[in-house]
Amino acid sequence: VAIFILVLVPFIVAQSKTEVYYTLFDSLPQDLVGIVGTNKLGEDFGMTPSHFILVHDDLTATQVSDLCDELKDVDGITQVVSLDSITGPGFDTELLPDSVMEILQSGGYKLILANSSYKTGTDAINSQLDKMIGLIKNVDPEGVITGEGAMTKDLIEVADVDFKNVNVWSIMAV
């Protein structure tokens, strides 16, 4: 038991000092072609993380437009757009080309696009996503949000559980 406790103490100290990060681009050499290209897109065109929101297509244009307005008020959201927020409730979508409708409304869902000023993998964007998910679920309990920010947030949550489980089992094995 004494040996176990002596070995356990360094494990606990090391674990508490280990910083886990998920901004993978920051950990790579900044002169890599992909990193340079991504940085250039951000600088030249203001490219920011985009959130792709899917809500059921039985929501009215007014409901979707109202949701877009609420999402615009979330800290760090720079713009929100959907077919309904552009056309309004009285617009006949049959006038639009099928190719446009396949992107914006198909498979039983409507697409909403929201851009964020926050960097992916940070506490700020994770908090932003939590607020957005709350707003979306108020309108459509089965609505979903995806994109780089949401997927990284999911990765963080899953990896955190995995790391904790591996640590516990590793300590127990020792």
Listing of model-derived features with the role each one plays in the protein:
Residues 1-23:
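Signature of alpha-helical transmembrane segments and their immediate interfacial
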Residues 17-174:
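Structured non-transmembrane domains adjacent to transmembrane bundles in polytopic membrane proteins
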